[in-house]
Every structure is written in structure tokens, then in C-alpha cells.
Amino acid sequence: MGSLNPKSLLHAALLSTALCGPGITNAQDVITDDTYFYGQSPPVYPSPEMPGNGSWASAYSKAVALVSQMTMAERANLTVGKSEGLNGCNGLTGSVPRLNFKGICMNDAGNGLRDTELVNSWPSGVHMGASWNKNLTYHRGYNMAGEFKTKGINVALGPVVGPFGRVPIGGRNWEGMDTDPYLSGKIAAQTVSGIQDAGIIASVKHFIGNEQEYKRNPSGNVSAVSSNIDDKTMHELYLWPFADTVHAGAACVMCSYNRLNNSYACQNSKAQNGLLKTELGFEGFVVSDWGALHAGHAAAEAGLDVVMPSSDLWGVSGENLTASVANGSLAESRLTDMATRIVASWYQMGQDKDFPELGLASSYLTPHTKVNARDPSSKPILLSGAMEGHVLVKNINNALPLKKPELLSIFGYDAPVSSQSNIGNIRYSYGTEAILDLNITDTPIDISLQIASNGTLTAGGGSGSNAPPYISAPFDALQEQAYNDDTSLFWDFVSVDPDVDAGSDACLVFLNAYSMENSDRPGLYDEFSDTLVNNVASKCNNTIVTIHNVGIRLVDQWIEHPNVTAVIFGHLPGQDSGRALVKLLYGVESFSGKLPYTIAKNESDYNVYNHSAPEGIYTQFPQSDFSEGVYLDYRDFDAKNITPRFEFGFGLTYTTFKYSDLSSSVVSNASTAYLPPITTIIQGGAQSLWDVVAEVQATVSNNGTMAAMEVAQLYVGIPNGPVRQLRGFEKVNIPVGESAVVEFELTRRDLSEWSVEEQSWVLQQGSYGIWVGSSSRNLPLTGNLIIGGS
């Protein structure tokens, strides 16, 4: 990382009721002694054996044949990560050389392949959530996975659907998609399909309830935080996107660090055996997050199949598991199933034939063979992905698009490229080291970990980041555009109160909101950046603000300033950040992104704002009670009639769209019975849950002056539930003067609620509200869908 000033050293130090019950009581209020912290999550045993059904039948058959040739010691060896011979892998399972099984190499995947050179840095999860583009997301996953395959890596450790974004200040929210289960599920499922169609195992993470970084791991005699989630909330929010990814065929799921209802997630039998492997019919293997194992064979009995990165509890080669089999405390069939699930996933992706040799290096500081994994065909996907995650939320006085300005003034620490992106920080990146402080001398404000002040932010920090081959920073791209347009530029990237040429046609201000793994954010805005915006706006009547943000960033400190004419949430675009932004600023392409979360006016508008901290008598057992249930983000704002600054699903374009011709109907012969028909369990749950029950259709017309993409959104009011819930979206490109018909299919699951009493999804009889429009609060088309009668 290079030398750090004392302030940076401080920053570096800072870096260093049961699921079946009707609800969760506040845990701190019912504790009488520490025995409370045991048995809060109901036991579900035995761990189901791999079904081997449907599309997995062939892989399962091959795996059974191969595993049957292994000794018990060899089977156990497959289940434990290796601390030696990694050769650049972040994790590596055991191997069986005599049977030509080389082991499974795993690497992180948030922005692309981590801990290596000659790969691309892709738009982040939150950026793709803001794109609302399923097809683009698929191609991002496919092309990204192609780089993993070229490097000989078997498993991409992504996508992320947990954290779900419950806590706005959550440090890893940027790796996930959004705060809505439907949107998150659809975007993540497309990511899984893309990754696995390229022949790479997708590892969906983190299962489950991993909603804060603070106290995510045990420390000393203090346990990891317990996410206390009731049955209904679990199914309707947190489990929902996992079901979508399993339905898409996900071959791996990673269990999380936190405790779930006071049982560590990686040894929680209700979660792994009950929800994942039984209810969702998961065919693949469960791998622990790195260092998340806290039990011996009990974790295997609870459904864990692979421990990473190594384990003394299971033994270096799994010898403690074989000993447990020998003494009868672990069933031999369980160990065999663990090995079978691993090998079947390998076969399912076709990795047994012509899979590339490992193309990583154990050290990049010594001579090594270079393997360039970048495919030129990825370039348009990288650029489109970068563009479509930008969200324009304000544009007055025709501020945008820019039209060959004579003079632009550019301000803010986020405009240039960071001063460092070298081989030393490919292992565990902090947003390409943009977090290192600039020598900002004209302000006493402590910016702490709120911003990355050393250059433009293209990704958050931690294991989800990687080393980009280049960064197109906003200032770089603006200079190139200035050359083409003969525009003159002034710039100041360090001052909080810069001089401003009064003749500037526009003043562009660049700031960011940063977060990283291992810590949560200090807040949702920072005084330094807000002061900068207000100071520039006081001197420039056409101030355009771009924020590269990891998630929710409040703007009410300056959003109504009359001289702030345009505001863009740029999210985390990856390596093509500046190139993409300039195309949008100058109207080569229209903005098309939509917010995947709600921007409030105040922190207090969020019913859950901060992470949970230890309190009460038993501070060694931190509790986080998810007592808000399903009412998060826009669902809560709607229920309480809170006016947001910018609502979920909001985003402007350079044109105008008109919605018309809403129609809806129940599919003929579809079952609308209260309980779903009894069907087989497929990947993702009971087959009947995926049956299409109803269809909705609407027309979107481009009445403006520029071709652009619009995201048509369908919301449904399910009886006894939130006011409305997202249940469909389609992104369509519509030329000027033309129209597009958007069609939405509603499955039984989409229209159902989870019944704790029935332990089933149930379809209420009656009238369902239907809304279609451009955001969660701009819904010009309204109607009703009648289920089960008139």
C-alpha cells in the first residue's frame, strides 16, 4: 500500500424465535441466563442426500460412480480446503490424483477475478441492480466467468444476495443487487445462468441473514451477531432471492459468518438442511465462508459440505470426519453425500473435459507465466454495463446533455484516477486503493472511512474488489471530449472551497460514498463532500454533481440548491467509468438506470438504519432482531406514507414515456387454490410455485425527442401484505415516436404469501391491486386482478 500518514494509519487500524415460529420476540428482553442462546433454531436432521433429479441426473450418476471408487479418507479429503499448494487460488478443495480429480479452485468474483493480473474489472452488483437489465446482467456473468475459465478456476464466489441491504450503512451492500427480493432474485438468477453457461460454478452468498459487518465474526468471548428472523420474513424477503438462484441451477451456496436465531449459519440445520436442501431442493454443495466454521462433525450433519480455507476442526485432510464415521457419530452416507455433491457440481459444469490448467501465480513479484484472460468481445458488455447503472435523479434548466461547452470547471476528489493501483494491492483491494488520503489541507473535517478521497471509486473495498487493467476516470474522459469539442477546462481536485471561473458553462463536481468488507459505513453522507458541493454551487449557477456510491447516499444537504441543476448516482461502474459517464453527459446515450433502493430525506426515515451492537447483560451474545418483518425500504415508506427524496425505481432519461393499455388476466386452467397443488420439489422449491397464474400487459410509448430505454415496473398489492410489491420489470429500448408492449408473467409464488400456520405458500382469494409505471410512486396505470372468483 505504500507509506501512510498518521491519519491513514488510524484508518488502517479501523479496517483491521425460531424459523418455524410465528414471530421473534426482542431477544434482549427475555434473557434470564445464557441457556437462552441455545436451541433457538429448530433442529432439522438428517441432511438430505443429493436428489440428482432433472438436469442434474447425468452429473449425479457420474459423481456416484466416481465417489464409489474413493476410500473414505479420500472422500473426507475433498471436503476440506488446503492451506498449501494453492497456486493463487483463494480456496482449494482436496484432490484424488489417482482418479484424475484435481480439486476445486475457488476465487472471488464481485467485480471480476481477484488476486491476479490481466483480467477486467466489471460493474459491481449494486450497479447491475441499478441497471434493471436482465439480459445485460446475463452477459456480464457469462463474459466474467469466461475469464475465470481461461485462468483455470472452477468456482466464482458470487453473486451476492446477502447482504440484502437491510441496514443502509452495511459495509458490503455494494456487492449485492438492491433492497427488493424480486429485483435481487431476478438479477442474481441471470448472473448465475451466465456464469454457469460459461462452465463455471456460481457460489451464491452469503446464506443467510448476513446483514451487517459489525460483529459478523466472534472475537474473544463475544459471539458473532445473531440475526433473529421470523419464519414469514425469512421466506418473503431473505430466502426469496436464494430461491431464484437455486431455480437457475446454482451449483454452490456459501454459508455466512453470522449466527441465525443464535445458531451459527454454517452449522444451522434448519437453514441448510431444512430451507436450502429440503424446501428449495438444492442439488449442489454448501461451502463455508472463510473461517466461518465453529464446529466439528456437527456442522457436517447440519448440512455443510465443504469448509474453507482449511480446518483444524475437521482435520487437515478431513481425518476428524473419518474418525467420526468410524465411531458412529457421523453417518457414512453423510460424508459420501458431501463428496458426491462436490463432484456432481464439477461434472454439471463440464469441468471434467478439456478444462484449462490453472493460470494463476503464487507470486506476481517473481517471474511467472502470464495468462491474459481478457476477451475483446467483452468490451461492449463492460461499457454498456457501466452506462446502464448510472441513475439521473435531477435535471433542470436543460443542464444535461452538455452541448459542446466552451468552458468547464471540474472539482472533487473523485474526478481523477487514484494515485496507485499496483501489484501490491491485488490481494485484498480497498477500491483500487482510492481510500488513501489526499493531502487535503484546507478543511478540519474528519472524512474517516466515509469517502475514498484518493481518486475515482470504481468498486467498494474488500474481497469483492479486483485489480483493473486500466481505469477510465471521469477527468480522463472529459479531457478527451474537451479535445474533440475544443473545450477549455479548469480543475481542482483537493480544495473544499475552490475558486470558480464565473464564465464556466457548467461546473462538474465529483464525490463518492465508500464502504468495504469488515466494517460498516459511519453514515450516509459526509460533511466534506457536502460542503464542497454547496461551495461550488454558491459560485456556479450550473453545478452538476456525480456521486460514485456504494449504495444509499443522502443528498438533502444540497439537493434543493437552485444552482445544483443535475445530479447523478453513478454507483460503481468498473474500469469504463469515465468513458461511460461522458457518453451519458453529452447525450450520446440516454440515462436509463433506476434506483434499486429508496433515497430518504433523513436517516430517521429508515426504520432500520444502524447495525445492531451488543447490549444488555449478555453482551457476549450480540442480538439483531429483525422485528420490522417485511417492511423495509419502499414497503415501509409506503406503509407509513413517508415521502422519500427519490423513490425506489426512480430514474430520469432524456426523453418522455407514456404508459397506456393496461390489461391483466388469470391464465386459463391455472390452479388458483389456496394451497399449491402437490408437486415434486425441483430446484427452487415445489414445481407448482413456478407455474404462471396470471399475465399483465401494458404499452409504453416514447413521446420525446431521443431514443432511450425505459424500465417498465409492475407492482402488486397482495392481500394482507405491504401496500405494493415489485413483481415484474422489463427494460425496453424504444425509438422516438414508437411504442413497445411489455408483458409480465406472474407465478403462484409471485402472488402468494407465506403462511406460518400452513408452512406453505398460500394464494389469497380476492382482489389484487395492479400498478404499472416508471417507479414505485409513479404508477399511471392501475387495475385489479381477481383470484378465485368475482
Protein language model features and the residues they cover:
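Short beta-strand elements
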Residues: 778-790
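Glycoside hydrolase catalytic-domain context in secreted enzymes
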Residues: 23-754, 760, 767-772, 776-777
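A short, solvent-exposed, low-complexity linear motif enriched for acidic/polar residues
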Residues: 765-769, 785-787
